[in-house]
């Protein structure tokens, strides 16, 4: 976040890669040893914070060009995140489970825009920071579609 906010996009890209490496390792360690509720909670909480901080960094780096697209992107992340978590909570209450996305600490509802796609978009944003507004708006549209898909899936499944 800080590197991106300061306009050091390549350093931001390095930190982004390190963050994703750490995120992947913590999940692998949990699956190889013991998965805990605390670990699952921290994993999802830090992921959603991370997803909001990257666009915020771009908004701070160039408010005139990036602030509105960053706000729209963050709003779209609220949609994907809230529909994802609302489904997981309700599925848990109803005793539903799946391992379609691998072994997870909660019901993992797939979507058009997931972690891999988000990271790919963030990589493009860091590599081509002048494209941020267009990339943010395109990705936000895809996230809003994902939100709609998840709401529909929740409505028809639960």
Report each predicted region and the residues it spans:
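Membrane-embedded alpha-helical segments that form the functional core of polytopic membrane enzymes
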Residues: 1-38, 131-143
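Membrane-interface alpha-helices at helix entry/exit sites of multi-pass transporters
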Residues: 40-43
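A feature for the membrane-embedded catalytic helix bundles of lipid/isoprenoid biosynthetic enzymes
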Residues: 45-158
């Amino acid at each position: 976040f800080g590197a991106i906010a300061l306009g050091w996009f390549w350093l931001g890209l390095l930190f982004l890669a390190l963050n994703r490496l750490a995120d992947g390792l913590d999940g692998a360690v949990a699956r190889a040893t013991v998965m805990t509720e605390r670990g699952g909670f921290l994993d999802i909480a830090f992921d959603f914070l991370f997803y909001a901080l990257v666009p915020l960094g771009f908004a701070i780096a160039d408010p005139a060009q990036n602030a509105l697209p960053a706000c729209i992107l963050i709003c779209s992340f609220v949609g994907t995140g809230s529909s994802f978590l609302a489904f997981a909570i309700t599925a848990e209450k109803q005793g539903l489970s799946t391992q379609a996305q691998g072994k997870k600490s909660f019901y993992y509802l797939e979507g058009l825009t997931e972690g891999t796609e988000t990271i790919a978009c963030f990589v493009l944003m860091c590599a081509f920071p002048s494209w941020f507004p267009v990339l943010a708006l395109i990705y936000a549209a895809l996230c809003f579609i994902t939100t709609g898909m998840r709401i529909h899936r929740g409505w028809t499944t639960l």
